[in-house]
Regions:
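Active-site loop segments of alpha/beta catalytic cores
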Residues: 1-42, 87-90, 99, 103, ...
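Segments that shape or occlude catalytic/ligand-binding pockets
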Residues: 34-77
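A structural signal for short, hydrophobic beta-strand segments that form beta-sheets
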Residues: 76-81, 85
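Extended Gly/Ser/Thr-rich low-complexity repeat segments
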Residues: 97-112
Length: 366
C-alpha cells in the first residue's frame, strides 16, 4: 500500500480510487449515535465519560472553515411551548418544530418560513444576500496552521445546504413538491440563487486554502426512490449541479458528494453524469445494496451502506455487515465503511463495540 498518508489525503485518495496505506476508519454519519443511544451505551459500558473518537480511535473527517451558507442574519431562536416530554421551538432557520427532550428521535416539523413567492423574495433580500462579507468568518492563519498540524482535508458545503434540501427547509417537503407545479419559477429561482450564493462563498475559501471536498445535502429520497421525477431533477437541479462541477474543475476539487436517505438509485444514475463523485449513506432498509452500486458504478465513492439494524441483533448479524464492508474494500475500493445512518437506541453497546473492532481490522488490512 506504500507510504503512510496524512489523514486528509488518505480520505480523498480512498474515495477517488488512488492507492492508500489503509482505509479511513470511523468517518461519516454512520459512526454516530442518537443522544438516547449514547446514553444507553454509556450505561451499558459503565463509562459515563465514553468518548467514541478517543475510545474507539476514529480517524479525523474533513475540516470545514467557518462559512455560513444559510440565512444571514438567522432567525432568533425561540422556545414557544414546553412540556415534561417535549419542547416546541422556532429554530434559527425559521422552522417551528417539536422535539423530544430525550433526543430519541427526529423532531416533528410544524411550520416553515416560506409560504408564498413573496415570502421568498423577502427572505432572499433580507437574509440571503449574495456576497455578504459576514458569510465567511474564518481566521485563515489559524485554519492553515490547523491543517498543517492535523493533515486534514478541506470541505465546503454541509447540512442543511442543497439545491433540493434547502428549499425543502424553507417550504416544507409537501409544499415544495407542489411548488414544482404551482410555482416552478420560484423553485427554479431558489435553486439558482442559492447555488450562486454558495459558490460566491466558496470562491473566497478557494482564495485562501485548497478545497478537497464539496458536499451537497439533499435528503430527497424515500423507500420508492426520488421524491421528484428524474425529469424534474434534470430540469430544475442539474443546471445548478453543473455550476458546482465547473467550480470543482476550476479549483481542482477531487470529491463532490451528495447525502440523500432512502433509495438513491435513480439519483446516483443521474447525478454522476453531472459531476457527483460520492454518495452516502445508502440505507439498506430502503433497498440499497452497496455491492450492486459498486458493480454498476465502479468509479463511485461510497460511504456507509452497512445495515444499522444489525446492531440490535447478534454478532452473526454484525458479521454479515462486516463481510459486506470487506467485500467492498476488496472489490474496487473507493469505499469507507460505516452504518447507513445515525445509530438508533435499540443498538447494543457490545454489538457496536464488536462491529467497530472488526471494521477497524478491515480498514487496517487485518
Amino acid at each position: 500500500m506504500g507510504k503512510a498518508w496524512p489523514c486528509g489525503e488518505r480520505l480523498v485518495r480512498c474515495l477517488t480510487g488512488e492507492p492508500v496505506d489503509r482505509v479511513p476508519f470511523g468517518v461519516g454519519i454512520g459512526w454516530w449515535p442518537w443522544g438516547q443511544t449514547l446514553y444507553r451505551w454509556r450505561s451499558e459500558a459503565g463509562r459515563p465519560d465514553l468518548d467514541l473518537v478517543r475510545d474507539l480511535g476514529y480517524d479525523p473527517s474533513f475540516a470545514s472553515p467557518a462559512v455560513n451558507g444559510g440565512l444571514f442574519p438567522a432567525f432568533e431562536h425561540k422556545v414557544l411551548e414546553e412540556t415534561p416530554e417535549f419542547v416546541v421551538t422556532r429554530n434559527d432557520r425559521g422552522i417551528t418544530l417539536r422535539d423530544r427532550r430525550d433526543g430519541m428521535s427526529m423532531p416533528e416539523f410544524l411550520d416553515y418560513p416560506v409560504k408564498t413567492p413573496q415570502d421568498w423574495e423577502r427572505l432572499k433580500t433580507e437574509r440571503l444576500r449574495l456576497g455578504d462579507p459576514g458569510r465567511v468568518t474564518e481566521d485563515w492563519d489559524a485554519f492553515r496552521a490547523r491543517l498543517k498540524r492535523t493533515g486534514e482535508a478541506v470541505q465546503v458545503g454541509a447540512f442543511p445546504y442543497g439545491m433540493f434540501g434547502t428549499p425543502r427547509d424553507l417550504l416544507g417537503v409537501e409544499a415544495l413538491l407542489t411548488a414544482f407545479y404551482d410555482a416552478p419559477e420560484m423553485v427554479r429561482d431558489m435553486m439558482e440563487h442559492l447555488t450562486g450564493l454558495w459558490i460566491s462563498a466558496w470562491e473566497r475559501v478557494a482564495a485562501e486554502v485548497r478545497i478537497d471536498h464539496i458536499h451537497i445535502w439533499e435528503d430527497m429520497s424515500g423507500r420508492q426512490g426520488s421524491l421528484i421525477s428524474p425529469a424534474m431533477v434534470e430540469q430544475f437541479m442539474m443546471p445548478c449541479y453543473d455550476r458546482v462541477a465547473d467550480f470543482a474543475r476550476a479549483h481542482g476539487v477531487r470529491v463532490v458528494s451528495v447525502d440523500t436517505d432512502g433509495n438513491c438509485g435513480e439519483l446516483v444514475t443521474l447525478m454522476t453524469k453531472h459531476g457527483i463523485t460520492m454518495f452516502f449513506p445508502f440505507e439498506v432498509q430502503a433497498g440499497n445494496d452497496i455491492r450492486e452500486y459498486r458493480r454498476r458504478f465502479p468509479k463511485l465513492g461510497i460511504l456507509g451502506g452497512l445495515d444499522k439494524r444489525a446492531l440490535a441483533g447478534t454478532h452473526a448479524d454484525v458479521d454479515a455487515e462486516v463481510e459486506r464492508a470487506a467485500w467492498m474494500v476488496r472489490n474496487g475500493g473507493r469505499y469507507i465503511p460505516g452504518f447507513d445512518h445515525l445509530i438508533p437506541p435499540d443498538a447494543k453497546w457490545e454489538n457496536f463495540r464488536y462491529a467497530a473492532e472488526r471494521l477497524k481490522a478491515v480498514c487496517f488490512g487485518g
